Swiss-Prot record:
SUPFAM superfamilies: Glyceraldehyde-3-phosphate dehydrogenase-like, C-terminal domain (SSF55347), NAD(P)-binding Rossmann-fold domains (SSF51735). It comes from the Eukaryota. PANTHER family: GLYCERALDEHYDE 3-PHOSPHATE DEHYDROGENASE (PTHR10836), GLYCERALDEHYDE-3-PHOSPHATE DEHYDROGENASE 1, CYTOSOLIC (PTHR10836:SF133). One of its GO terms (cellular component) is cytosol. Signal peptide: none annotated. It catalyses: D-glyceraldehyde 3-phosphate + phosphate + NAD(+) = (2R)-3-phospho-glyceroyl phosphate + NADH + H(+). Coiled coil: none annotated. The record marks H181 as: Activates thiol group during catalysis. This is Glyceraldehyde-3-phosphate dehydrogenase 1, cytosolic. It comes from Hordeum vulgare (Barley). Homotetramer.
Amino acid sequence: MGKIKIGINGFGRIGRLVARVALQSDDVELVAVNDPFITTEYMTYMFKYDTVHGHWKHSDIKLKDDKTLLFGEKPVTVFGVRNPEEIPWGEAGADYVVESTGVFTDKDKAAAHLKGGAKKVVISAPSKDAPMFVVGVNEDKYTSDVNIVSNASCTTNCLAPLAKVINDNFGIIEGLMTTVHAITATQKTVDGPSSKDWRGGRAASFNIIPSSTGAAKAVGKVLPELNGKLTGMSFRVPTVDVSVVDLTVRTEKAASYDDIKKAIKAASEGKLKGIMGYVEEDLVSTDFVGDSRSSIFDAKAGIALNDHFVKLVSWYDNEWGYSNRVVDLIRHMAKTQ
């Protein structure tokens, strides 16, 4: 199999990091990027310098012309088209398109990319109607006739592997999740208008902001056996990257906290290696910046009330870990063709 050729629509946080992942991969080739709101020159600057993930050090990046970026000797075509139907992905050779604008998240809107010659589209956000896949949890349910998929959310990617391990080993009766989540681009630097979510309009770097999240309910879509058993909420906190899931569950089978730790450790070294992590050191959020795993279980942070009721804590780099999974999902789809 030749290299998997991908295009990226939307060069925001996830778009740029998916590009970084692709450019460091031997089996994936970034061939095109579309963003109507930034110039090619500005694109090179935004890609090269990153407050959280640091300078790009893997190759020189320069402008060949206003339609081409050069990463070392590797040319990447740049488009600035607003209407996804009109982006000529086919001409650029992009078979897989990462839809990371945050705008075209439903099936019909994302399908517009197919008209420009893309063969498959991966939405880097939850979708109300496109099938959602979480690598390590349900990607084996993907079939090659499906052209539009969602990689779910970063929080679902952290929660679902953890919930799967607990449910497979001990059974989950019910559970509540809280994610303590780093700020994202949708928030405000100072208090501003946010008519749908009043709290969300308050200054991100100065407040702990309670918020809603569909991440726990979405686990029921990727793990149908947990449908209706989990729900959750979010606190947005003033850090720029890395979030943490707190999952509190009642289990069917009696299990000590040690039993649970052993099951998660075994999964992290076995089937879920590279997806699930396990740490016993006294770590804090910045220690996970740049961690490519979806969910890193913090063995010391969790606590059990009794053998049926337990609180579990798992970290995730909500930018880098998630962007790695987007590329992993594309790899899996390519293998399935």
